[in-house]
UniProtKB/Swiss-Prot annotation:
InterPro entries: Alkaline_phosphatase_core_sf, Sulfatase_N
Keywords assigned by UniProt, alphabetized: Calcium, Hydrolase, Metal-binding
MF terms in GO: glycosaminoglycan binding; metal ion binding; N-acetylglucosamine-6-sulfatase activity
The protein's name: Sulfatase ppz1
Binding residues annotated for Ca(2+), in chain numbering: D13, D203, N204
Length: 424
């Protein structure tokens, strides 16, 4: 798992080894529910977590160790291959999570700087620039919140962003080397590789200059919420591109299912349909940080409530670059907004089944299973009158439940209008 890797800025195009390593597919092998984490560590720890050439680590709860002059991603690669070798020798099922910091920004104290590549990669891609997509350095009609007042980027700012982008690509080359080392170890044990699932992903997306934003990751735009996710292993079709929406709440349920481990009721997510028998099922999208995405073959919407209590509604079939705050859908906009607001309220503090099946949580009678069902005029009063709205009393620097307004919706048909229990 990389740190803050984009999809829409094309960083994967500069990682041929990572892409090639996930081209193939291993045959089916027996599953085993007794998987173990072979060892614990090393773990990158502050103050050197995001320092590329003086990382601070702890191994198996031992003493802290600094590694001046050693490149962080290479340290992670060497330890990972060592752990993998130990796990293979043990002859037992294992789980290995590998999390280099690239392409995260270099962070020393409060300073936020461009990523630092390994010396061997620092002269690559010198002519590459941030992709000049239609949203680059462009405002958006109808934008709200701080997007509304962002000034046009100056030439020196754009030059800095191009340099920042190149440094991200350069730092990812050591990740490619890491993947190559891990694959070489697995390929030297074909029987292990044939029964091992591999995943490549990131924790966040990233933007650089889109909508006039400086480098960052905390917005609800496509660049931030879409991330790489590549899977390889028994039963996963080679070269297949899945179009179903998922989130990282689905990762653990997916791993459990592939390993033959029973799922837990408290899981917020559900297994991804990575194999053919699941890919025919509809998958529900969940996004619970005040931005909601509903995505199907027939319609796709993004609905956002800002801490200023301003609202955005985008028809993503019409414009997936957020060029205007509007929709051309046949749905009535006020009625649609009311449904989406209630769905967002259901998800903003959900847990367990409420995260996986929000419509069924709202309508336990089972007569509403999606947005089209919810748009029935018979439910107008329920959505427009009975429901509280997603609101904020003020803008906070972080999550503060006291300013979040209502945390859960009213359930349809509940005599006492009892709301679902929110996550604490």
């Amino acid at each position: 798992m990389t740190d803050d890797q984009d999809v829409h800025l094309n960083s994967l195009d500069f990682q041929p080894i990572s892409l090639l390593s996930f081209e193939g597919v291993a045959p089916y092998g027996p599953s085993c529910a007794q998987h173990k984490c072979h060892r614990c560590g090393p773990v990158l720890i502050d103050p050197g977590t995001c320092v590329y050439n003086n990382a601070s680590m702890v191994l198996d709860n031992g003493a802290w160790a600094f590694h001046p002059g050693s490149y962080s991603t290479d340290l992670v690669a060497n330890r990972s291959v060592e752990f993998l070798g130990d796990a293979i020798k043990a002859g037992e099922p294992f789980f290995l999570g590998v999390t280099p910091i690239a392409p995260h920004a270099e962070t020393v104290g409060d300073a936020f700087e461009a990523p630092v590549p390994a010396k061997r990669h620092e002269n690559l891609f010198l002519d590459v620039k941030v992709p000049r997509s239609p949203s680059f350095n462009a405002g958006a009609a109808g934008a709200v919140g701080y997007f509304r007042n962002l000034p046009k980027l100056a030439h020196d700012q754009i030059d800095y962003m191009d340099t920042f982008y190149r440094r991200r690509l350069q730092s990812l080359q050591a990740v490619d080397d890491l993947i190559e080392d891990i694959m070489a170890k697995l390929e030297s044990h074909p029987d292990v590789l044939a029964n091992t699932y591999l995943f490549y992903t990131s924790d966040n997306g990233y933007h650089i200059g889109q909508h006039r934003l400086p480098p960052g990751k905390t917005c609800g735009i496509e660049e931030d919420v879409n991330i790489p996710f590549i899977a390889r292993g028994p039963g996963i079709a080679a070269g297949h591109v899945g179009r179903f929406p998922t989130s990282h709440t689905d990762l653990v349920p997916t791993i459990f299912e592939l390993a033959g481990i029973p799922l837990r009721d408290e899981f917020d997510g559900e297994p991804m349909p990575l194999k053919g028998q699941r890919q025919s099922n509809d998958a529900l999208n969940r996004n619970t940080y005040k931005t909601l995405r509903v995505d199907t073959d027939d319609y796709a919407f993004m609905y956002t409530v800002w801490c200023t209590n301003e609202h955005e509604l985008y028809d993503m079939k019409m414009n997936n670059l957020y060029g205007s705050n509007s929709t051309t859908s046949s749905f009535d906009i006020p009625q649609l907004s009311a449904r989406l607001d209630t769905l967002l309220l259901t998800l903003k503090a959900c847990k367990g089944i409420a995260c996986r099946r929000p419509w069924q949580t709202l309508f336990p009678t089972g007569n509403v299973n999606g947005l089209v069902d919810a748009m029935d005029p018979l439910h107008d009063s329920f959505f427009l009158v009975s429901q509280p709205r997603v609101t904020f009393t003020t803008c906070s620097l972080g999550y503060n439940a006291e300013v979040e307004g209502p945390l859960s919706p009213v359930i349809f048909g509940a005599a006492d209008e009892t709301a679902i229990e929110p996550r604490q």
